[in-house]
Structure formats: C-alpha cells, structure tokens
Amino acid sequence: LADSGHNLRCMICDRKDAYAFERARKLGIKTYYVSYYKRDREEAEKDICSILEAENIQLVVLAGFMRLLTPYLVDRFRNRIMNIHPALLPKHPGTHGIPDSYNSEDRELGITIHYVDYGMDSGPVIVQKSFERDFTESIEEIEEKIHKLEHIHYPETIKKVLDELDSQHQRG
C-alpha cells in the first residue's frame, strides 16, 4: 500500500505481545492495544470505535483478529470492515480454515476476502482466489500456497476498495 496513495493510519491489536506492534513501529505506524481481558466484547469495541473515529478511519482491515465483532462495531463501519480467510467460503469458516480445507476432498483451495457482518466468515465476498489442489502435497505446502495468495491479493484488494471509497466520497 506504500505506493497506493493511501495511508495506514494506525494498527489496533488485542494481543499485547503481538509481533505486529514491532512491525508497525518500525514503519512509523501509530499503535494501540485494546484489551478484551475480563471485559465484554462490546465494551472493548467501544474503545476500538473511539480510536477508529478519532483517527478518521475509512476502512478497517482485519488480519489475524480471531474474534467475532459485535453489532456495535459492525454497524458503525458497515461494508467498511474487511477480513481475509484462508479457505474458499462458504466452505470451512472459522479458525481452522487451512486444516479443514486440507482434510477435505476439495479439488480447489484458496482464500476469500470479504466484508464483515454479524456472523463468522459470512459477510459479502469481495474476491476469492484459488489453485487446483495436488493431493500429494503436505499441509505445510498447502499453507505456503495459501499464504502466498493472501500476501499478493489482500493488499491489491484493499487498494481497490479504498479507491472505490474515495470515488464514492468524491461523487457525493
């Protein structure tokens, strides 16, 4: 996204020890830690919404965030929260997308980039990318192929969605 004309304003994480903090700081990106510990989800997400609104965030991009969002957050950023999932939804939703795909008889495996709604990996699909499976490959080889697709297509899709949001904003 560095050459896209869009700014990554901040990174919010719910895991204090996440490597993402170090990576963001090295890139000069503002970081925030929001704890869910001994709090209900909506309470934590009120803090997240306050940050997103203060930073004037146009698009929320999830990566490695393994929680369902509450209606409180989803409603405030409807069709402006993206997630990436390491399986071809609607097959294999949830936290085990890669092993579930690997253990299936699916001939095609891949990724889904989608908007977030109230359900688990159930929001409108933005894009899916896939490859034909070789049943002799190990789970590690499949995982590598899936991550390669993620690293190529998530930034491309984020840029495309931001460009569309900019275009809508300019029109009115």
Model-derived features with residue positions:
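N-terminal Rossmann-like dinucleotide-binding module
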Residues: 1-19, 23
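Conserved acidic residues
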Residues: 9, 58, 79
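Short beta->alpha connector loops at strand-helix junctions that form conserved
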Residues: 32-37, 84
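Short, conserved SAM-binding/catalytic segment
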Residues: 25-33
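Residue-level detector of anion-binding/catalytic polar loops
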Residues: 30, 58, 107
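Donor/substrate-binding cores of folate-linked one-carbon enzymes
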Residues: 4-6, 14, 63-169
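N-terminal glycine-rich "phosphate-gripper" loop used for MgATP/nucleotide binding
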Residues: 13-15, 37, 41, 45, ...
